[in-house]
Amino acid sequence: NAAVVEDKKNGLDGHNPWNEAAKKLESETLEEYGVEKVSELPFNYSGYRMQKGEEHEAQIYKKHYDILNKIAIKQNKVYESLSFLSPFISLRFLSMDVSNTSDKLHWKFTNAAEKYRLQKQEFLNYDIKDNSKYGERGYNMTEEKFKQLPKFNFTPPTNSEIIKENTQNILFLCLWLFLPFVGLLIFSKNK
């Protein structure tokens, strides 16, 4: 997407120390700590810069992702509002929720995965920042520190949550099953 590329181009790239935003961050950090070179900082500046770049890019992707999410929500609301016209629409939404393949769950899972990815990157970048030397290559995290790496947790909705979210779909399906029988009873009595 051109808008994402443009936003990234004008911001901090944590892996490119020569772009304008990275130079500005370096200058501000040196001034804040009262030193002249990044090697004089009390931490590994590379890990710090990578984390700041990660935070900047995460904001960009979240902004554009939220735009897509809002569009998808609007589209699904229109589609769902028409579900009284056909039992297949209601059945589609209900079956997608029951099988955990709905758009809602996709967005929920993706947000949880992105939140975890950011936590993990922060953990790794700050480990480099706090425990390695500037310019050091081949740094390895300790086994003890690695055990502290955050774990990914995601809980799909329970059956009761699925039923609650699909009350309208269940109602429309029941109507689609019930109304033909009522019509059959009415018309069969008239003959």
What do the PLM-derived regions correspond to, one by one?
Residues 1-191:
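Transmembrane alpha-helical segments and their membrane-interface loop/helix boundaries
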